[in-house]
From Swiss-Prot:
Lineage of producing organism: Bacteria, Bacillati, Mycoplasmatota, Mycoplasmoidales, Mycoplasmoidaceae
Name of the protein in its database record: Fructose-bisphosphate aldolase
Record's keyword terms, sorted: Glycolysis, Lyase, Metal-binding, Zinc
Pfam families in alphabetical order: F_bP_aldolase
Binding-site list for Zn(2+) 2: 105, 135
GO BP, one annotated term: glycolytic process
Family: Belongs to the class II fructose-bisphosphate aldolase family.
KW Metal-binding (keyword) present: yes
Pathway: Carbohydrate degradation; glycolysis; D-glyceraldehyde 3-phosphate and glycerone phosphate from D-glucose: step 4/4
Quaternary structure and partners: Homodimer.
Entries under PROSITE patterns matching the protein: ALDOLASE_CLASS_II_1, ALDOLASE_CLASS_II_2
Length: 288
């Protein structure tokens, strides 16, 4: 059964830990993420971007896939199925299809338009008991074609968006999607603390891959309650595929090394291992 993330983030905020949000890209990803969460007894947010949703052939595939895996793997922990960086229309479609949570990314819009669409979306989400994450200040890097420069969120705008009472707030705090460049300035900790105090909302750290562990832990102590991970899982997956191919295992005809199930076994385990590392970094182990 899918749940919204309202209660899990409220508990995380009180307990000063975070909930891992892991983007999935296919069947192996979904299975690995749910396996890790169940193994660690951790609540989990299974997330899909619009691009991944299209790649996986849409809502009619993704929702039954996740629900089916929850049942077949006997997953006992709370699971949220979340649309990541959705447009207004995509969020409505996701809610109608059965997602238990959506993130409306209106950060690239004029603030008034972002505010008004956010307000309408929250009203719609309440009808299906779904959670809503909103964004103020564009996150750096690229996410499904949307490019942000890593700007810092306007505190007054954060306060206004918080008045809508979303379940989580993603604010630009110097974070970047993808691999962090060597000249990255780092997270703006004073801004995280300020936004947390004035909004009293669970805050979200997008672009969580590649940030120093101590910095992530400090951010969590200041109010980050949801850590978004994608790139690190992709890198771990690709690394294991490269190892398999470069060792010529795919050319072993006697052992049927060309079997995709054998090719994907270690890469899938690498996602499980990465998720377990992030669960421990977040402090969500045994918090289900």
């Amino acid at each position: 059964m899918l749940v919204n993330f309202k209660l899990m983030l409220q508990k995380a905020k009180l307990g000063k830990y975070a909930i891992p949000h892991i983007n999935i890209n296919n069947y192996e990803w979904a299975k690995a993420v749910l396996t890790a969460a169940n193994q660690a007894n951790s609540p989990i947010i299974v997330s899909v971007s619009e691009g991944a949703l299209k790649y996986m052939s849409g809502y009619s595939v993704v929702i039954p896939l996740v629900k089916g895996l929850i049942e077949s793997l006997s997953v006992k922990v709370p699971v949220t199925l979340h649309l990541d960086h959705g447009s207004y229309d995509a969020c409505i479609q996701a809610l109608q299809a059965g997602f238990s949570s959506v993130m409306f990314d209106g950060s690239h819009l004029p603030f008034e338009e972002n505010f008004n669409k956010s307000k309408k979306l929250i009203e719609i989400a309440q009808k299906t008991n779904a959670s809503v994450e909103l964004e103020v200040g564009t996150i750096g890097g690229e996410e499904d074609g949307v490019i942000g420069q890593g700007e810092l969120a306007n505190v007054d705008e954060c306060k206004q968006i918080a008045s809508l009472k979303p379940d989580a707030l993603a604010a630009g705090i110097g974070n970047i999607h993808g691999i962090y460049p060597k000249n990255w300035k780092g997270l703006n900790f004073p801004l995280i603390e300020t936004i947390s105090k004035i909004t009293n909302l669970p805050l979200v750290l997008h672009g969580g891959s590649g940030i120093l562990e101590n910095d992530v832990k400090k951010a969590i102590s200041l109010g980050i309650c949801k850590l978004n991970i994608n790139t690190e899982c992709q890198l771990a997956f690709a690394h294991e595929i490269r190892k398999y191919i470069e060792s010529n295992k795919d050319l072993d005809l006697n052992k049927k090394g060309y079997d995709p199930r054998k090719l994907l076994k270690e890469p899938t385990q690498a996602i499980v291992d990465t998720c377990l590392e992030k669960i421990d970094l977040c402090g969500s182990r045994n918090k289900a």
